[in-house]
């Protein structure tokens, strides 16, 4: 992220920054970038309020259009950060798609209640299936927009009631982008 900020401060063109970000070899799960037409998709492990703020700051610096976000909150963890993360998302994104993350043994509906209780915004919805949330986020993109997919990063599974279900945000996004490209051809 620091390299992106430096490029912005040096007045490097947004197009070159996006190309450079896509070519960076960052740790898995941290600012993994996918290019989709004129859009940028960023997959990041950001799962705290501070981490979300940092990812949004970068996204706004490199985005000519709108920023959208897909995120969820982990179960059996700090409940107080859930509403904070929802507020950050709603204040920094054109539209927010809330979904599940790793509910572990906690009831996912209770997690959604914690995420939305007292939330005074109308730019969000809950999509209960994470894959559907990601594909919906991609479908919302117009020219020069950015989609943030936050919370899971490099993780290869979702933990639900002790079961580890194979799932990877980057893989899901790539597969859907390829489906779209194939349907156009």
Feature-to-residue mapping (PLM):
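ATP-dependent carboxylate-amine ligase
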Residues: 2-185
């Amino acid at each position: 992220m620091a390299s992106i900020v430096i490029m912005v401060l040096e007045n490097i063109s947004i197009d070159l920054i996006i190309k450079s970000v896509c070519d960076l070899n960052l740790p898995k799960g941290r600012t993994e970038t996918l290019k989709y037409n004129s859009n940028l998709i960023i997959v990041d492990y950001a799962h705290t309020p501070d981490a979300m703020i940092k990812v949004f700051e970068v996204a706004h610096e490199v985005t000519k259009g709108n920023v959208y976000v897909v995120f969820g909150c982990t179960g059996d963890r700090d409940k107080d950060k859930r509403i904070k993360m929802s507020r950050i998302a709603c204040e920094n994104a054109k539209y927010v798609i809330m979904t599940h993350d790793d509910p572990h043994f906690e009831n996912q509906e209770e997690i959604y209640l914690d995420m939305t209780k007292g939330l005074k915004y109308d730019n969000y919805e809950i999509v209960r299936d994470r894959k559907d949330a990601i594909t919906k986020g991609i479908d919302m993109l117009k020219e020069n927009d950015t989609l943030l997919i936050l919370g899971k990063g490099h993780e290869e599974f979702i933990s639900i009631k002790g079961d580890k279900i194979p799932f990877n945000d980057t893989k899901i996004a790539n597969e859907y982008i390829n489906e779209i490209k194939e349907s156009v051809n």
